C-alpha cells in the first residue's frame, strides 16, 4: 500500500515541477518581449567613412633638419667601410700608377679605367635626372576636387549631402541596416562611392569616433530623436572619386582645410581622431 501512495506523490511532484517550468518560461518570454520593446533606442544608427589618401612624397626638410641630415651623412662617411666599387677604384688607381712608372704589365691593361668609366656614366645619368615637381597643377589652381594635390599631406574625402533643405558637408555616411556590422556599413559606403572605382584598407573593426545629432523639433518624436554616427578609418589604395557633372559635391581636404567645410560641432568630433600630419600615424 505504501508503494502505490509513494508513486502517486512522486508523480504529483513531477507534475508541479513541469507546471512551474512552463509558467516560468512563459513569464520570461513575456518579460523579454516587453523589455525589447521598451528598450528600443530612439536613436538611429549610421556608419561614416573617413577615407584618407596618405602622403605620396616626404615633406620638405626644415633648415634644422637639413643641417642634422648633413651632419649624420658626414658621420656615416667617416665611419663607414669602403664599398666593393671603391676598393676596385683604388686597385685600378694603383695599377695605373704602376703603368706610369713602367712597372705595369701590358697584359693587365684591360679594364684599368672601368671603374672610372662607370662613375662617368653614373654622373651623366644623374645630371639628366629631373625630379618631379612638389607643386602640381591642382595646387596652382587650388582644385580641391583633385586627388593630385598636397602630395606631402594627408587628404580626407568630404561629400556634400542634402539634409532637409540644407546642403551640408560631411564624411560619407549611410544608415545602418539590420543584420550588418557597423564596419559593414562603412564598407558599403566605399562600394557605392564612384561605382566601385576605389579600393581601400580599413584600419580595424572598431569605430575610431562617433557623433550624434538630434532631428529638428518639427520632425522629432519620442521614438525617433536623432542619429548616432560611427566613423571608420580607411586608407585609399587605388582609384579616385570621380563623378561626371558632380565635381562640386566632393573635395579632398587637408586637416587645416576641414574648417572651411564642416560645421563646428561636427568638426570638433572629427578632429578628435585625426592626428596632426607631422605625427607618426596617418593624419
Swiss-Prot record:
Compartments (UniProt record): Mitochondrion
Any one Pfam family match given in the protein's UniProt record, by short name: MRP-L46
N6-acetyllysine carried by residues: 228
GO cellular component: cell junction; cytosol; mitochondrial inner membrane; mitochondrial large ribosomal subunit; mitochondrion; nucleoplasm
GO BP: mitochondrial translation
Record-linked PANTHER family: 39S RIBOSOMAL PROTEIN L46, MITOCHONDRIAL PRECURSOR-RELATED, LARGE RIBOSOMAL SUBUNIT PROTEIN ML46
Assigned protein family: Belongs to the mitochondrion-specific ribosomal protein mL46 family.
Listed name of the protein: Large ribosomal subunit protein mL46
Lineage: Eukaryota, Metazoa, Chordata, Craniata, Vertebrata
Gene from which this protein is expressed: Mrpl46
Amino acid at each position: 500500500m505504501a508503494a502505490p501512495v509513494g508513486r502517486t506523490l512522486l508523480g504529483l511532484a513531477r507534475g508541479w515541477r513541469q507546471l512551474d517550468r512552463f509558467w516560468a518560461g512563459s513569464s520570461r518570454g513575456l518579460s523579454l518581449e516587453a523589455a525589447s520593446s521598451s528598450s528600443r533606442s530612439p536613436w538611429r544608427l549610421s556608419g561614416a567613412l573617413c577615407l584618407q589618401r596618405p602622403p605620396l612624397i616626404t615633406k620638405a626638410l626644415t633648415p634644422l633638419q637639413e643641417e642634422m641630415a648633413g651632419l649624420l651623412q658626414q658621420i656615416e662617411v667617416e665611419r663607414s667601410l669602403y664599398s666593393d666599387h671603391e676598393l676596385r677604384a683604388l686597385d685600378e688607381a694603383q695599377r695605373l700608377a704602376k703603368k706610369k712608372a713602367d712597372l705595369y704589365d701590358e697584359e693587365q691593361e684591360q679594364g684599368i679605367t672601368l671603374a672610372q668609366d662607370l662613375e662617368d656614366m653614373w654622373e651623366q645619368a644623374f645630371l639628366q635626372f629631373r625630379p618631379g615637381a612638389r607643386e602640381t597643377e591642382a595646387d596652382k589652381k587650388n582644385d580641391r576636387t583633385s586627388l593630385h594635390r598636397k602630395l606631402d599631406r594627408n587628404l580626407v574625402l568630404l561629400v556634400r549631402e542634402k539634409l532637409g533643405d540644407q546642403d551640408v558637408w560631411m564624411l560619407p555616411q549611410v544608415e545602418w541596416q539590420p543584420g550588418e556590422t557597423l564596419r559593414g556599413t562603412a564598407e558599403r559606403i566605399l562600394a557605392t562611392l564612384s561605382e566601385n572605382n576605389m579600393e581601400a584598407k580599413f584600419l580595424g573593426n572598431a569605430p575610431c569616433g562617433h557623433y550624434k545629432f538630434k532631428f529638428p523639433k518639427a520632425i522629432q518624436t519620442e521614438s525617433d530623436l536623432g542619429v548616432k554616427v560611427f566613423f571608420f578609418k580607411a586608407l585609399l589604395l587605388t582609384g579616385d572619386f570621380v563623378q561626371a557633372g558632380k565635381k562640386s559635391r566632393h573635395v579632398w581636404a587637408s586637416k587645416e582645410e576641414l574648417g572651411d567645410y564642416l560645421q563646428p560641432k561636427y568638426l570638433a568630433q572629427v578632429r578628435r581622431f585625426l592626428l596632426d600630419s607631422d605625427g607618426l600615424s596617418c593624419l
